[in-house]
Design a protein with these regions (language model features):
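Bacterial N-terminal signal peptides that target proteins for export
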Residues: 1-8
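C-terminal motif of bacterial Sec signal peptides marking the signal peptidase cleavage site
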Residues: 15-17
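Boundary regions of SH3-family modules and the immediately adjacent low-complexity/disordered segments
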Residues: 19-28, 32, 36, 70-123, ...
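Short, structured beta-strand/loop micro-motifs enriched in basic residues and often containing a Trp
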Residues: 32-42, 125-137
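Short alpha-helical segments in extracytoplasmic peptidoglycan/chitin-binding modules
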Residues: 37, 51-54, 60, 79-80, ...
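Conserved beta-strand/loop element in small beta-rich adapter and peptidoglycan-binding domains
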Residues: 46-71, 138-199
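Short beta-strand elements that form the blades of beta-propeller/WD-repeat-like
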Residues: 271-288, 330-340
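Hydrophilic extracytoplasmic domains
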Residues: 305-374
Length: 374
């Protein structure tokens, strides 16, 4: 009788395991530029099939195996079935695959700003994580690691409280399974460095990515890893303030700031631009500080092949997104500005050309902003 009970318990465990395995079965997409499906998780396993970024695989099961370099840590592996002619089955490191539910979450994130034109373009200074949320206090929201030099469109940005666990860590690179976390920089700085107010908040960019860079169409990137890719046509017109957003005023607004080309759109043909500027400050950044504090419209004379200042606003308080509307010479742009009462208002600026073909801006009355002292 006892043997029968043990057999029943054993069978129940088997069926429970099969049920769990079936529930976890799903699909995933390869995020690594290239990866190998292997015969096993062993170091000496054979390579069965090379898969590339964007390839879809069926996930059959997962397991954690000791890292060969550190037995105190484990690496997660997935047993997958490829969609090749031979339907190859084998094992692949989990970090090389994005699960389908994560990809769906990224698509929903992209849908939130589907009608928003890119506000700027950026490029990674170093390899960095692409996350579902603007939070680097843990690894659960990491979708994939982007390569250094990856380019993307910037849709928006925000500041969030800096995690206490990363007060001294100024990067966002999740370690490969089995490796140590990036070491924190020493907090005992040299006495000859000036004492600056400590930043309690950190900047994050919401980005839109082309398929060749990431299967996930959108995500969040830690701001210190990002270099703004200011177009070569306007980069030399900065006058003490940073260019934080820009859009072309000639051509189709939908074509603005495409980062699918190398160097994130740095090279661009001459033209007219809407540029949003922001003053620099040595004071800590607040969570609700404005995105920009001045509007700069740069015109372009095709005959002389020279740029000129069509409009420069007084100091103001503005927030993204900026939207360019219309076609041809009948265009305008809309910005979210704060009025004298502190209320937010969508403000429209009309564009026109005078008899000589010079670009002009019909600017509404906008409340000037009190400049913050540096």
């Amino acid at each position: 009788m006892r043997q029968v009970k043990l057999l029943l318990i054993f069978l129940a465990l088997i069926f429970a395991g099969c049920s769990t395995l079936a529930q976890r079965s799903s699909t995933g997409v390869v995020v690594a530029r290239r990866a190998q499906i292997r015969s096993s998780t062993a170091v000496v396993a054979a390579d069965l099939l090379q898969v590339n970024r964007g390839d879809v695989v069926d996930i059959l099961e997962s397991t954690d195996v000791p890292d060969p370099n550190d037995n105190t840590r484990k690496e997660r592996w997935l047993r997958v079935k490829a969609h090749d002619e031979d339907t190859t089955e084998g094992w692949i490191e989990a970090r090389n695959v994005m699960l389908d539910d994560v990809l769906e979450a990224a698509k929903k994130l992209a849908a939130e700003d589907a009608n928003v034109t890119a506000q700027a373009s950026g490029q990674l200074r170093a390899s960095s994580n692409l996350r579902l949320t603007a939070d680097r206090s843990g690894n659960d929201n990491i979708m994939m690691r982007l390569d250094s030099g990856s380019t993307f469109d910037i849709i928006s940005w925000k500041r969030v409280p800096k995690p206490k666990s990363s007060e001294s860590i100024e990067t966002d690179v999740a370690p490969k399974a089995g490796s140590a976390q990036p070491g924190a920089r020493s907090s005992n700085r040299q006495g000859d460095e000036p004492n600056e107010p400590e930043e309690t908040n950190e900047l994050w960019y919401k980005v839109r990515l082309p398929p060749e860079i990431s299967p996930a169409p959108a995500g969040w990137i830690y701001g210190k890893q990002v270099e703004l890719a200011v177009p070569s046509d306007i980069i030399f017109y900065r006058t003490g303030r940073e260019f934080v957003a820009w859009q072309r005023l000639d051509g189709d607004p939908k074509d603005n700031n495409s980062s699918t080309e190398k160097d994130g759109g740095r090279e661009s043909k001459p033209g007219s631009w809407l540029i949003l500027e922001k003053s620099s400050s040595n004071q800590p950044h607040s969570l609700d500080e404005p995105d920009f504090d001045r509007i700069y419209v740069l015109g372009y004379d095709k005959r002389s092949q020279e740029h000129y200042t069509a409009y420069r606003s007084p100091d103001l308080t503005g927030y993204l997104p900026a939207k360019v509307e219309g076609r041809g010479d009948d265009k305008s742009f809309v910005l979210r500005l704060q009025d004298e009462s502190g209320a937010m208002k969508d403000t429209q600026y009309s564009l026109y050309k005078d008899a000589r073909g010079v670009l002009k801006v019909n600017a509404p009355n906008v409340a000037p902003r009190e400049r913050r002292r540096k």
